[in-house]
């Protein structure tokens, strides 16, 4: 005798994602004429390959429509139509089917031939979050998470944003602007540093005027600084110049 137990948290997670994928694919099909041409359920995210390129605005609309459908808590219907009923039924299917066909319906969102497990109503999906949309072949590949995975993702993003908010003394909703200002300040400082280096490099170039071939070692220079130093010295030394920075333990840049 063999007894088995369902790992319910894992099963429910997979059901949430499977049903969420149907809702997103069905709405994308109805709104934008997309065919679902690929689907992979991973341990972190699931991916959907759609046959039509979507704009970022369309992706936002798709996410909003899918969540609205979830929150309306529609019952999910499963049926085995007769061959006569199938002939007049419009449903999604990736291949021609024979024999008994199982139809899973999300009223108002999707009707699809499917043999997988699903939640009993759209509300049990909880939440769907589209994480990315990248061009893939002639269409797009969308990464998404549903249910608890979506909540966990948003919690991680919130925690990261909260830490950035504290580090930059910015409000949680204004961290992007604070980071942009920090990057701008960094670029300004880099420009000032480069100007100071160029003054020093010009003095070194004068020091090595007509010195011929040179091999120079300078501490703490970046690859860009080394290139600018070499260019300055080459104009005055009358020979070839190689510039290095670093040390034996960590290696050298040149």
Protein language model features and the residues they cover:
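Divalent metal-coordination and catalytic microenvironments
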Residues: 22-24, 48, 116, 142, ...
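Well-ordered mid-protein domain cores that form the structural environment of catalytic cofactors
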Residues: 5, 23-30
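Generic alpha-helical secondary structure
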Residues: 17-21, 25, 59, 63, ...
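Short glycine-centered, acidic/aromatic-flanked micro-motifs in structured strand/loop junctions
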Residues: 6, 50-52, 217-219
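Short pre-active-site segment immediately N-terminal to the catalytic Zn-binding motif
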Residues: 8-18
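Terminal appendage regions of diverse proteins
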Residues: 125, 131-254
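Conserved nucleotide-binding/hydrolysis modules and their immediate coupling elements
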Residues: 1
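Functional cores that coordinate and move charged inorganic groups
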Residues: 10, 29-136
């Amino acid at each position: 005798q063999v007894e088995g137990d369902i790992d319910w948290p894992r099963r429910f997670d997979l059901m949430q994602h499977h049903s969420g994928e149907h809702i997103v694919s069905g709405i994308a099909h109805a709104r934008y004429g997309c065919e679902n041409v690929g689907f992979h359920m991973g341990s972190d995210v699931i991916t959907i390959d759609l046959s039509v390129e979507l704009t970022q605005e369309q992706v936002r609309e798709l996410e909003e429509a899918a969540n609205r459908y979830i929150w309306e808590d529609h019952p999910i219907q499963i049926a085995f139509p007769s061959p006569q009923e199938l002939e007049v039924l419009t449903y999604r299917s990736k291949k021609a089917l024979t024999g008994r066909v199982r139809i899973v319906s999300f009223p108002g969102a999707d009707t699809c031939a499917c043999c997988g497990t699903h939640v009993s109503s759209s509300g049990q999906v909880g939440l769907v979050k589209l994480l990315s949309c990248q061009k893939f072949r002639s269409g797009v590949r969308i990464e998404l998470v549903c249910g608890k995975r979506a909540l966990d993702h948003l919690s991680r993003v919130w925690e990261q944003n909260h830490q950035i908010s504290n580090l930059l003394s910015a409000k949680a909703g204004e961290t992007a602007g604070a980071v942009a200002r920090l990057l701008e300040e960094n670029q300004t400082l880099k420009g000032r540093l480069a100007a100071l280096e160029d003054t020093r490099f010009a003095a070194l170039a004068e020091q090595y005027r007509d010195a011929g071939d040179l091999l120079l070692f300078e501490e703490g220079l970046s690859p860009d600084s080394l290139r600018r130093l070499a260019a300055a010295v080459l104009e005055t030394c009358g020979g070839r110049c190689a510039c290095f920075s670093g040390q034996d333990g960590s290696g050298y840049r040149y």
